[in-house]
């Protein structure tokens, strides 16, 4: 890449848009959970988000299944995540299998497979049906707005994070770009839920850079899903051939390239996947968006001509946010490893959990920046560990615990590092969450690695 031309920007006084006890940067699932949890603890909270909606990759990225939240028959992610699911279900914006259907059988597989509510990490066939929820992205936005409003969070949308404000090793707030110009926002504790570790990186925290495929998720309307499923089960050989051809056109997808949604005739497609792109670079993001749409339109043409049930399909929308899975990863007080996840290591300072793995409090804390805690897919983990632990429910579990930790620091006048993880867990449980402080039967012996 050619060296960029440089200009020198003249400094200017900035208006202060907000001062609060806790400042949360990033209104995705982890940020929502963090803001709500902290506010429920009684502290003042400001939440800033660059888009005109809440939900991040859940809503704007249209990752429309909440999974990785069960350990066998045990539901391991509850709290604010489960509140979202249940409230969306009450307005017909979420669908999940009832307890009696959460089992392994050919009957349940045929009934639920196209909802994506199966244990995708299982090696047995058919894949077991588990507690997971398919949802509508606008349903998410609606319930998120309700919950943020009910909690009393000061929400500032259309605010694009630009720079951390740091003084003598302590973060004080952030600068955001807005239509009104640059604005400063201050918080006694700052929570980075940006997804790309934007705040922590700007503040000077140590991090690694990972990389994983990106996706331009889209939805199709006008699909006769029952006809499509009859073709799948009634003509397996013909289905397999055409499904393979469709996947070849899209150029990268999971086993099932389309799944049902709560909206009749509307399916969502978690594809096409594209590799070798850096989601922190504008040129690569632009390339992904253009290439993704090109593949989508080619797939639609093929589906109309060749796939029963898709004869009249059309593109409802392409996700406004690129599906980014991994960029910067914090190098915090503890770095979670792939073995930690695969071996189900339980930590003495566990404060959050996913399917059958556990998140230590230290993995949310930068080593060298005071007043800052992180939550979400950019937490302190190796690339390989993060790929196994980055789903939305565990990120919400991290967010809820980070919000509680921030509030405890404010109330006690304490540093984040000095907060007792047991106190965090106790308050998360009071809010209906499962912070993982009581390990499941298949967890591995306690671990408290050195910082």
Residue ranges of model-derived segments:
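Extreme N-terminal leader/targeting segments of oxidoreductases
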Residues: 1-22
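Conserved N-terminal/central alpha/beta ligand/cofactor-binding core
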Residues: 2, 43-44, 49-163
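Core beta-strand elements of the Rossmann-like FAD/NAD(P) dinucleotide-binding domain
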Residues: 18-20, 180-189
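N-terminal Rossmann-like FAD-binding beta1-loop-alpha1 element of flavoenzymes
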Residues: 22-46
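Short hydrophobic core segments
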Residues: 25, 185-195
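Mobile, glycine/GP-rich and aromatic-enriched active-site lid/loop segments adjacent to catalytic centers
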Residues: 103-134, 138, 142, 150, ...
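Conserved beta-strand-loop-beta-strand element in the redox core of flavoprotein oxidoreductases
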Residues: 165-184
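Flavin (primarily FAD) binding-site architecture
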Residues: 192-205
């Amino acid at each position: 890449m050619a060296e960029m031309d440089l200009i020198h920007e003249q400094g200017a006084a900035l208006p202060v848009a907000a001062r609060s006890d806790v400042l949360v940067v990033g209104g995705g699932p982890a940020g929502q959970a963090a803001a709500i949890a902290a506010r429920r603890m009684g502290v003042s909270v400001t939440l800033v988000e660059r888009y005109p909606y809440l939900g991040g990759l859940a809503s704007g990225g249209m990752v429309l299944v909440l999974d990785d939240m069960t350990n066998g028959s045990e539901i391991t992610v509850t709290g604010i995540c489960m509140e979202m699911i249940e409230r969306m279900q009450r307005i017909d914006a979420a669908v999940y299998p009832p307890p009696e259907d959460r089992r392994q059988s050919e009957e349940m597989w045929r009934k639920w497979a196209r909802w994506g509510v199966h244990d995708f990490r299982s090696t047995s066939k058919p894949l077991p049906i588990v507690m997971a929820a398919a949802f509508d992205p606008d349903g998410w936005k609606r319930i998120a707005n309700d919950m943020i409003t009910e909690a009393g969070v000061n929400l500032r949308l259309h605010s694009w994070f630009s720079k951390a404000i740091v003084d003598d090793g302590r973060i004080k707030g952030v600068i955001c770009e807005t239509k009104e110009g640059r604005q400063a926002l201050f918080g006694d504790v700052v929570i980075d839920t940006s997804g790309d570790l934007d705040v922590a990186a700007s503040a000077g925290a140590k991090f690694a850079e990972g990389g994983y495929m990106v996706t331009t998720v889209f939805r199709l309307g006008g699909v006769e899903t029952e006809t499509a499923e009859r073709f799948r089960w009634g003509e397996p050989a013909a289905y397999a051939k055409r499904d393979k051809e469709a996947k070849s056109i899209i150029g990268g997808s999971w086993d099932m390239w389309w799944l049902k949604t709560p909206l009749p005739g509307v399916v969502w497609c978690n594809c096409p996947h594209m590799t070798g792109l850096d989601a922190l670079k504008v040129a690569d993001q632009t390339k992904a968006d253009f290439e993704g749409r090109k593949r989508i339109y080619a797939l639609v043409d093929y589906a109309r001509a060749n796939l029963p049930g898709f004869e009249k399909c059309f593109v409802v929308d392409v996700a406004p946010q690129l599906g980014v899975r991994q960029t910067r990863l914090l190098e915090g007080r503890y770095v979670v490893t792939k073995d930690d996840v695969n071996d189900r290591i339980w930590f003495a300072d566990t404060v959050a959990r996913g399917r059958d793995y556990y998140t230590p409090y230290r993995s949310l804390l930068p080593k060298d920046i005071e007043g800052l805690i992180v939550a979400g897919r950019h937490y302190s983990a190796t690339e390989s560990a993060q790929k196994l632990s980055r789903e939305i429910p565990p990120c919400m579990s991290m967010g809820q615990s980070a919000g509680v930790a921030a509030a405890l620091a404010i109330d006690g006048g304490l540093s984040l590092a000095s907060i007792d993880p047991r106190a965090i867990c106790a308050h998360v449980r009071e809010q209906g969450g499962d912070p993982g402080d009581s390990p499941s039967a298949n967890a591995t012996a306690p671990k408290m690695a050195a910082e």
